Amino acid sequence: MDMRVPAQLLGLLLLWVPGARCDIQLTQSPSSLSASVGDRVTITCRVSQGISSYLNWYRQKPGKVPKLLIYSASNLQSGVPSRFSGSGSGTDFTLTISSLQPEDVATYYGQRTYNAP
């Protein structure tokens, strides 16, 4: 039985930092996708300016606060399943789910950060 899982993604993020100009844009792709349980899913994030490895990945489910998955581009947050991984630096970043599970249906987004949590 083919169980399709829609993974909803946030397409465009504008970052605001207190005391700083709002001039960095993060653009994610795809803006939405449909995948099957067990599929490998890749989400990319392109940043308008180089930010080294200062990017975190979050997952948010309806009515819940965002959950940190990956910090500093490639570090798995404690307690997060190993099917999640992150890579990239500078302007191009990737979040990969190696084997999609039903509980992974959510909104995923990248956020520029200044340091590890």
UniProtKB/Swiss-Prot annotation:
GO cellular component, one term: extracellular region
Major subcellular location class: secreted
This protein's UniProt keywords: Adaptive immunity, Cell membrane, Immunity, Immunoglobulin, Immunoglobulin domain, Membrane, Secreted, Signal
Compartment annotation: Secreted; Cell membrane
Residue span(s) of domain Ig-like: 24-117
Claim: Cell membrane is one of the keywords in the record: yes
Residues making up the signal peptide according to the UniProt record: 1-22
Lineage top rank: taxon: Eukaryota
Claim: Chloroplast is one of the keywords in the record: no
Cystine pairs: none
Primary role: Probable non-functional open reading frame (ORF) of V region of the variable domain of immunoglobulin light chains. Non-functional ORF generally cannot participate in the synthesis of a productive immunoglobulin chain due to altered V-(D)-J or switch recombination and/or splicing site (at mRNA level) and/or conserved amino acid change (protein level). Immunoglobulins, also known as antibodies, are membrane-bound or secreted glycoproteins produced by B lymphocytes.
Subunit structure: Most probably, the immunoglobulin is not assembled due to incorrect folding of light chain. Immunoglobulins are composed of two identical heavy chains and two identical light chains; disulfide-linked.
Protein name: Probable non-functional immunoglobulinn kappa variable 1-37
Originating species: Homo sapiens (Human)
